Amino acid sequence: MSVMDTLVSRRTYRRFAQKAVPQDVVDDIVEAVRLSSCGANRQAVRLVVVNKPEAVAKVQPLVKWAAYLPPEQGTPKADELPTLYVAVVQDTSIPGDLATDTGIALANMTLAAWDKGVGSCIMGAINKPALTQLLGIEEPQKLAFMVAFGYPAHKAHIVPLTAETGVKYYLDENRDYCVPKRSKEEIAKYL
């Protein structure tokens, strides 16, 4: 698959098959973050890998799913939950643009996972105080995001953004995600 094909097909996934993500894929996710570009090569992004079933179960009530959908549609059911979470942590003792470096790391890790057929959901609507305690994250480190991983149990595809759709994703008749995206003409100016 070409890089552009990967970018088109790597969407957010919120329902997963109950199949563990193999350790070699977890290792690729970690390696993708380790290799990430970052400002001044400061490497301030850290990870906490949560892949033991009992630990994954403790994370689940501390994250929120699919803000644009009613919970009964957007929240995965017990047999659709992710089998792996990765906490993305910023080391605030290292100066630099942590937001940009974190964004690059998030892109790398989700693309590395998707290369192996593992879907992901980057989650910012999380209970940071409770997760920080649960995951043993201490100052000067700060929890930024949780990322859910697993083998997708639904499809997701890009649709044109229109006045009718707006930016909100929605489910089609098969419970697959439709993700409106702006046109190239709307996002790029050529001089």
Language-model regions, residue ranges each:
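Acidic, surface-exposed loops and disordered segments
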Residues: M1-L191
